[in-house]
Amino acid sequence: MFASWTPTCYINLGPAYLIDLAHTRYTVQASQDVLLLRNTTVTSHKFGPDNLFTLKFYPGGLEAVLGINQVQFTDRLLPLTQVLPVALLAQLKQPHTFAERVALVEQFLVRAFRRSAHPDHYVRLVHDAIGEYQASGLQLNTSLVAERLFLTSKTINRYFHRVIGTSPSQYFALLRVRTALTAFVADPPAFAPSDYGYYDRSHFAKAVRHVTGQPLPAAKR
């Protein structure tokens, strides 16, 4: 998996496994639940059939719902108990169905969100900026996104570093690659690089290699 800046919780319902975070390898025991920011490439290695229940937050989502800023988690593998209550994790490890686990998580997150006083100003503007970029068909540059939100380029850059941990230009480029690569994998013959702001197939392939480290035919989402 390549970078997405989406805080992701891995609740382990099965055996131990290995996980590579950039150039560091960790062993996650059967009893361990972990959190990754996914600001870099992540590779997992299973010893057998894996059984992971995952929960992924939108960039800035941890802060919007739980009041926890994600920037502190950059390049780290953390115990999930730093984010979710031990009691909730114990419930999720019981022999429930997938739908029952989803319901448990939803109940907890909805209660946590309702306890939040007001949406953070920084988080709201970053989400608005991402929405503007997506609404433009991934075509706008950072300056134009900032202009639509009545912000300066310097201000929007500061907000992205504060909420996500990277610059808006880097995040938008990553979002564009992920979106385009999803479309390419789904239907390669119908894929048109220009639909995603790339000049041609070569330009797209170069972006994919830069983000994934793999040539286009072998790249995975």
List each model region and its residues:
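Alpha-helical bundle regulatory/interaction domains
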Residues: 1-127, 133-143, 148-153, 166-167, ...
